[in-house]
Regions:
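N-terminal auxiliary segments of SAM/dcSAM-dependent transferases
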Residues: 1-151
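Short polybasic amphipathic segments
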Residues: 156-162
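Conserved SAM-binding loop and adjacent beta-strand
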Residues: 164-177
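Well-ordered alpha-helical segments embedded in enzymatic catalytic cores
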Residues: 177-184, 199
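Conserved class I S-adenosyl-L-methionine
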Residues: 184-197
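Conserved SAM-binding loop of SAM-dependent methyltransferases across substrates and taxa
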Residues: 196-208
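Conserved SAM-binding motif I beta-strand of class I
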Residues: 211-216
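S-adenosyl-L-methionine
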Residues: 218-251
Length: 251
């Protein structure tokens, strides 16, 4: 069906179409880099450019990152706009201190322990290895800015592998995406999905939370959590894990 739009509405639609295309393009570029070559830029390369140009290492990384994902900043005005509206506000150098001092990370010990097919260990990000860190930011004009973080040093995080394959982790992204809902938790809390118990841990730490009920359908995960992780929680008596499907439980 053909729509007869006013000139102003036609302009708005054209702008929205352009923004949607740019949202899609930046997501594809980020996904290719993060999935295929996340450690392409090493610390030596970044710091060498920073020293040569007399700029902070974080700025050197962003410049190299732009080139690595295929943006032609000097010659292409569209690419310069992508760098300005997506990469400058969305690709951030992070301090590792808040994540290393997270109460869950400091309380729950993930030594090299094997339990059947499971192994408790640590994964790591290399210096200047970018990763998703937080929910995308939606601007007033419907631009979606992915939040990408990186550290200037190596950073390790709790990890569980299944038959040698990374299965679950507690990364800065988990901390960032759960921060708001943890802050709002109160009373009797119900949550779907156990993970490694990060949300349940932090919710149970709050005095205003009476109980935390977790619905999890993976019985193996529940056993692993009850045997190896839950005993380390200070407020474990507040937590109940039910083996059920979330949709079935809701009905």
């Amino acid at each position: 069906m053909k729509l007869n739009l006013s000139p102003s509405d036609a302009l708005r639609v054209a702008r929205l179409k352009k923004i949607t295309e740019e949202n899609d393009r930046i997501l594809r570029l980020y996904a290719d880099y993060l999935n295929l070559t996340p450690r392409l830029l090493d610390a030596w390369t970044v710091r060498d450019l920073a020293a040569d140009c007399g700029i902070p290492a974080a700025d050197a990384f962003r410049a190299l990152f732009c080139a690595s994902i295929g943006l032609e900043i000097p010659d292409n005005p569209d690419d310069r706009r992508l760098e300005r509206v997506y990469i400058q506000p969305g690709v951030r150098c992070l301090s590792p201190a808040p994540y290393r001092n997270d109460a869950y990370v400091k309380t729950v010990r993930f030594g090299d322990l094997s339990v059947g097919k499971w192994r408790f260990t640590h994964g790591e990000y290399h210096a200047f290895e970018p990763f998703v860190c937080g929910h995308p930011v939606l601007t007033s004009d419907f631009r979606e800015i992915p939040q990408i973080g990186f550290f200037e040093e190596r950073f390790s995080f709790p990890s569980v592998t299944e038959n040698g394959v990374e299965w679950m982790t507690v990364t800065p992204n988990e901390a960032e995406t759960m921060r708001a809902v943890i802050a709002e938790a109160h009373g009797r809390v119900l949550t779907y999905g156990l993970g490694l118990g990060y949300f349940a841990f932090h919710a149970s730490q709050k005095p205003e939370v009476q109980s935390v009920t977790v619905i999890e359908r993976d019985s193996d995960l529940i056993g692993l959590f009850r045997d190896c992780i839950l005993p380390q929680f200070p407020n474990r008596d507040k937590i109940t894990v039910l083996n059920a499907d979330a949709f079935g439980f809701t009905e």
